[in-house]
């Protein structure tokens, strides 16, 4: 999540109503701070800790607030690989483009001068068996070997985004990561091309859904909207709709319209009509 209006109601549901205490709500606005990262690294309710493996000294306030993106550095690195590949692999890992290597060997480097991202084109190597076990929709003809994250045009990656990348690097598709649909594109961490909508949240997948066009998991979204979500109160003429609540209602209407359109495109007309 990103703002108060899409976060506090979820905290209420978990804290007071005991709903989905196995899931972890993470507010990206707070993820720039060390005290909130501390909380994310601890279990809460029935949820295990968020997969952030940094030590506190590595993210304490004033440290790694922003990591410069310097794509020109990669040319030098590749030249070093040609000259002395074994030594360089020990220093910066097997693949200079790989997200986990970049975090471990560059971003977390003890030398402040080397705490950079040496490329604007990052890859995440995909564990295909883990993807098959994950239960996510296969949003492509085949599972890709790698996932590409483009940082073109970015001058720096700030701490909250870096924490998102750390979660992605560590989770290995065994724990699903979602972004609320109310989060603005500026906070996607350049991962928007890999989202699959399942309801009020988009699941991060290894599939480039912008290329495949498979951006909606109609089975999960239909089940959520028709069976799992609870709606009520709007038929009460005395119910006050303020600006914020009105926007939320419009968001839900758009969800139904989007799902109906996709169901029709997939030939599932009966389900579309039930919406």
Q: For each predicted feature, which ranges?
A:
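ER/secretory pathway lumenal C-terminal domains and tails of membrane proteins involved
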Residues: 2, 6-275
